[in-house]
Every structure is written in C-alpha cells, then in structure tokens.
C-alpha cells in the first residue's frame, strides 16, 4: 500500500492540500480561495470558519483526486500564514472574534506607546522581533480588551489563543489538542527564543494570561490525530511550521549559511545561523528556523513588502502588461541606456529599512521611457531589495564569508527566467531554482514524514533536493556596481538621507 503524506498549506488568500509520495513527488493538489474582510482602514480579518472549511474541503478533494483513503496517509503536516491571531471558546470551539490577519495594522498605536515607554529593547532581546502590529502579541491584547467579556473569560481559563496552526489542530482533533510549534510561537512577541518558553515578563507587559496559550512542541513530532469522522479514519498529525520556516525546510537549508528566498506578493529571505541566535544590527529579525529533537536552529529573516505585487501593479494599475507572464519578455526589450528605478514602497519599505510611512517612486524617467523600461524597473526592484537583504545578512552574521552565497528561491515569481538571471547578476551569486516548486508544502510534508519514519534524517533528505536550474552571474562588475549605486541613490532620495554601500 502506498504511504502518502498530506500537507496542509493554509495561506492568506487560499488554502491548499497536497499529497506527497515517499519520493517527495506530488500525487494530488487541491486549492480553495476564501475572502478577506476589511472592516476599517488598515484592518484585515478572516472568518475562522472560512479557514476551517477551506482546509477540510481541500484535504478531502486531494484524497479524492489521488483515489486514496485516510488509511493510505501516513501523517499530516501543517504549514500556515504566521502571526494571524484567533481566540476561541474551549468548550464550544467558537471564535470570539474574526481572525486578525498578520497584515492588520490596528494596534500601531499600542506599539508606538510601548516603544515610547522604552519596552522595545526587552521585546527584541527576548523574542528577536520588533514591536510591530505585524506580530501576534498586540492582536491578542486588542481582542481581550475590545470584545465584551473576553478578558474575564480568558482570566477564568475559558478561552484559547492560537495562530492558524493551533486553531486547525484544535478543529482537526475535535478539540483534544491545544498546541503549536516553536516556529509559530516565536512570532507572537511572547516567546523567549533563547529559553524556548513563554516569557512571564512579556505576558505581563501585554497583559495576557498564561492559561490562554498553547503548549509548544518540536516542529516534527506528535500533534495528535484527526477526528475519525473527518476523513473516515484517524490520521496522525506529525509536523507543523510557519510558512517561511517550512519553505526553509523544503529547500533543505539545514546547514548554517544556507539562504532561501520566497517570492510571492512580498518576499521573505531566511539565513540559517545554526544553533546560536544572531542579534541583528541591521533591522533583520532573529527567529527560530525549526526545532527538532528539542534542539532549536535559528535564522535571520528579512521581509520585503512588495515583490510580485509590483508586477500586479503593472498589470492592474497601469495596464502595461496583460498578464504577469509577459513582464520578463517585455523587460528584456528595455533600452540599456534608460536607467529607470522603481522603489515600490506602496505600503512602506520593509527590511532592512523598516520605514512604514514612505511611499513609492519612479526615478530616471525621460521622454524615451516606455513600458519595457517600466517592466524592467519593476522586476529589478525585487532583485535590488533582495541584494539589500543579503548585504544586511552578511553584515550581521559573523560566520559568513561575505562572498557569493548560493540563494535557493521559490514562489510564483521564480518562474521568470529573466528575473532569476537578473537576480543572480545583481547579487553576484548563483541562484538555484528547485525542481519541486511547492517548497512550503514540501517542508510541512517532510516534518511529518520525518516523525513517522517515511522520510530520512535532514542530511539524507538534503541529498535528495533536486535542482531544476542554476542561474549564474553574467553581468560585468562595473555595470553591477553602477546599477546598485543608482538603486541606493533612489532609495536615499525617498528616505531623505544617504544609503551607504554595504
């Protein structure tokens, strides 16, 4: 009997379920989209039932597609949008409020007050994060303070908090399991990443009762079994990780110094720093990459707010292209003499600048600027921002050699050969595109398969990582330096200050 791994990839706009074979190839894939809700400016919410129904429906659809039953599934692995926050009734399972999504900015005022009171150094030292509405801690506090009766019920032990993984585990197990993994816990502002435990000082700071919190476990291990009524037989749940950490695992970035970058609407790059957390001096985040056998592996993380969204803007905002797939071909026809730069700060700039209030700009426009130059500027903006992240990572990590680290890439944008070649050119480093594009789901599947014995130890799994294509630098050094200097000049104009070379 074929043994399969069912990977649940719960994202911001859709949920996907994939069945992986023992050789890590995909046997089935199902996807269901669901709406986001925007009740006020800067607010983003999900209906918890949408998260649950889309998960259940896609899992069942993937099983039907593969002609497989629950007994052919060795284990389930879950990966999820991080930081999105839910609180529900322990007895009924009913959420007390819609899920507050990671993009939501409603707690900006609370974060600003806590910064003014001098609390950010404590938060950063314990958690590796910044005091920002992005993370779960202030979202929890908002729900407790704004939903009538929620704080009293939480103090009485009647409520449970979880990121999306915890909520799905609760629902899948029929309310028998209230747990999370270390990668998701590390995104809450409440978890000491050095001790691997919830932090009492931070709980007091945000006024959150410990009884609300899930138990924290390894990323690969026992997370309970599904209610037998859901799929016809119980299925063990054996792996959990936040989406960017799961992609790091799926890319087999197990050695210190290995870097992966995921390109979707935005971009997230993680550098494995091994068993020791590295405090950033360049506004990167320090986070847990994964936890296996009680041992934590850490990473430096940088986030770019706009990657694929720049191409969506070309298509939907300007009408420059009819489809995203056209952008690379159009960029290839751009005039090399036209040095046009797009700084895509549509919602501010992320790492390593963290300037939420600046807005985007185009530099270098002339009467000769055409759609081709705009397309090139949009795609190059992603490459320039990645170069900024990797420069910050090399500066932060003392064990890095500062030379051309290979970058492993995944996400929708990596299908563009032109963009990947330009990325390699501007990084002066090889860019590796894997054969298996669904690296986030593969990471969740691997963590589950490792726990149930279907997949080998990390070192052997890494040997089976399959390269589809390597892009190697082909741009002359002086050209690269001129283009990077032009980018930093454009960013400096936007910020109103010089941006130094790394």
Curated annotation (Swiss-Prot):
Recorded GO CC terms: cytosol
Provide the residue positions that the database annotates as binding sn-glycerol 3-phosphate: 12, 82-83, 134, 243
Record's function text: Key enzyme in the regulation of glycerol uptake and metabolism. Catalyzes the phosphorylation of glycerol to yield sn-glycerol 3-phosphate.
Q: Which GO terms describe its biological process?
A: glycerol catabolic process; glycerol metabolic process; glycerol-3-phosphate metabolic process
The answer to whether UniProt assigns keyword Isomerase to this entry is: no
Q: Where does ATP bind?
A: 12-14, 265, 308, 312, 412
- Alphabetical list of NCBIfam families matching this protein: glycerol_kin, PRK00047.1
Which residues take part in binding ADP? 12, 16, 265, 308, 412
Q: What is this protein called?
A: Glycerol kinase
Q: Which UniProt keywords apply?
A: ATP-binding, Glycerol metabolism, Kinase, Nucleotide-binding, Transferase
Pathway field: Polyol metabolism; glycerol degradation via glycerol kinase pathway; sn-glycerol 3-phosphate from glycerol: step 1/1
| Top-level taxon of origin | Bacteria
Activity regulation, per record = Inhibited by fructose 1,6-bisphosphate (FBP).
Q: Give the enzyme's EC designation.
A: 2.7.1.30
- Catalytic activity, as annotated: glycerol + ATP = sn-glycerol 3-phosphate + ADP + H(+)
Establish whether keyword Zinc is in the entry: no
Q: Which Pfam families match?
A: FGGY_C (PF02782), FGGY_N (PF00370)
Residues binding glycerol are: 82-83, 134, 243-244
MF terms in GO = ATP binding; glycerol kinase activity
Similarity field:
Belongs to the FGGY kinase family.
